[in-house]
Amino acid sequence: MADSKGSTSKEGFGDWCILEADCSDVEDDLGQLFERDTDSDISDLLDNCDLDQGNSRELFHQQECKQSEEQLQKLKRKYLSPKAVAQLSPRLESISLSPQQKSKRRLFAEQDSGLELTFNNEAEDVTPEVEVPAIDSRPDDDEGGSGDVDIHYTALLRSSNQKATLLAKFKQAFGVGFNELTRQFKSYKTCCNHWVVSVYAVHDDLFESSKQLLQQHCDYIWVRGIDAMSLYLLCFKAGKNRGTVHKLITTMLNVHEQQILSEPPKLRNTAAALFWYKGCMGPGVFTHGPYPEWIAQLTILGHKSAEASAFDLSVMVQWAFDNNLFEEADIAYGYARLAPEDSNAVAWLAHNNQAKYVRECAMMVRYYKKGQMRDMSMSEWIYTRIHEVEGEGQWSSIVKFLRYQEINFISFLAALKDLLHSVPKRNCILFHGPPNTGKSSFGMSLIKVLRGRVLSFVNSKSQFWLQPLGECKIALLDDVTDPCWVYMDQYLRNGLDGHFVSLDCKYRAPMQTKFPPLILTSNINVHAETNYRYLHSRIKGFEFKNPFPMKADNTPQFELTDQSWKSFFTRLWTHLDLSDQEDEGEHGESQRAFQCSARTANEHL
């Protein structure tokens, strides 16, 4: 027992496996073994019956039919139009798991016979044509649902070129191409106030609500829906670019940007304007606001189209005369701004000789104004000028300033009276004194209110520097120096006397005229200079001794404005011996304003 390893089992279980097999004499017979194997559980393993042919021909026929059906399906898939398949199941046909591959093109052609390339290109370029099924028209406002909208979405997704599909559907719905009504903006950042927007497959409720929601953004709205297409003409209150318009439409109509076509309209195309004008008269069109200006100009007959047949220069001259415009630049700019309201201005802008007419207009206005000035007396001129001044002022500020300069007001008033009446030897007044005493400011304020002319001795080298004296009622020669005094002493004695002189004018023969009342300012007291003794009797002088006073805010203490001079002349009208305007017809019989244009047929007499 010492050789046994491991633990010993309990009693009765000494061995855990059978070590030897028990022999049996019964199994020694081979015949019995074969008989027992034949009668095993797997019986009838071999079929020893006689063979017959069976139904093999039917099986072969079934296999041939199946193969023929497969070949037929392949031919149908190759040659049959997808339209038949789409009619069977449109939704199933619209589902595509793999994207369509575009045809490939080689950058460099190979130098061979071309046979292989031809076969390859034919195999690669063949792409199945997609035919979009016809979509039913838009239902009435009380009907419709999400099913039709889903069909429109499906039709748009099936198309390979969505923009071309939208353009085709737009033309099919409205009978006119989208590009025939619009002009193209390639940039998304270009702003415009007017936009034509076409939206595909909009829900009916959102389509109706957009008519009210867009009114807060637009001055004019034109909306129409046919079939699945909706057309908008929007005139926004402020300029918008395409991106802003798309954002507004997608938010309001709950559509994708691929469903939108947007371009600005053609503003100068009469046919396009007639489309919008006549379209608003048809059924199913909603409009809000007045017609845009470009539609009205191209379609509505009125003063801007029927009456603006020819340009009338006299109307332009009358306008410039009434507005006191003499310069060519002012006339051109002002009359161009008048174009939206005046038919004659529109005709002038359309003319090829705008500059020629502007020059002629300015020339005629100067002629008329000069003739009007010469026809007026000094009293009429002053009365006309001060009544053009708006507002009221204090005449006492002028009197206080003269007293501040220690000038006798009675003497100044008498000298001004003689000056305005052009009394010989009293036709010129001189303000002299130290610098910064207000001489030029006082003289310039008087010249401004009376619309006089200013002379500059810097132009004395030209023989035409005195030409403005023949075109005004009063003139000012500022800052007279010694060379100017010498010139006046030598050449202007007769002019200062108030007698007729020969005045040389540019492009014209010398004219016979009198010098108008002349005001001089200088730092030199000519009465204290013996060299100019011949001028002493021709010039009345007033000395400005004190510096011009200023306030703490650097504004003049004495207001020498147009309103102050208006009050001055009104208050001292009789003291200056100016004529009463009642005697000249101001309060008597009515006087017609000057008219230089032809009277219209319907004008009141």
UniProtKB/Swiss-Prot annotation:
Can form hexamers. Interacts with E2 protein; this interaction increases E1 DNA binding specificity. Interacts with host DNA polymerase subunit POLA2. Interacts with host single stranded DNA-binding protein RPA1. Interacts with host TOP1; this interaction stimulates the enzymatic activity of TOP1. GO terms for biological process: DNA replication. GO terms for molecular function: ATP binding; ATP hydrolysis activity; DNA binding; DNA helicase activity. It is an enzyme of class 5 (isomerase). InterPro entries: Helicase_SF3_DNA-vir, P-loop_NTPase, PPV_DNA_helicase_E1_C, PPV_DNA_helicase_E1_N, PPV_E1_DBD, PPV_E1_DBD_sf, Rep_E1_papillomaV, Znf_lg_T-Ag_D1_dom_sf. This is Replication protein E1. ATP-dependent DNA 3'-5' helicase required for initiation of viral DNA replication. It forms a complex with the viral E2 protein. The E1-E2 complex binds to the replication origin which contains binding sites for both proteins. During the initial step, a dimer of E1 interacts with a dimer of protein E2 leading to a complex that binds the viral origin of replication with high specificity. Then, a second dimer of E1 displaces the E2 dimer in an ATP-dependent manner to form the E1 tetramer. The gene is E1.
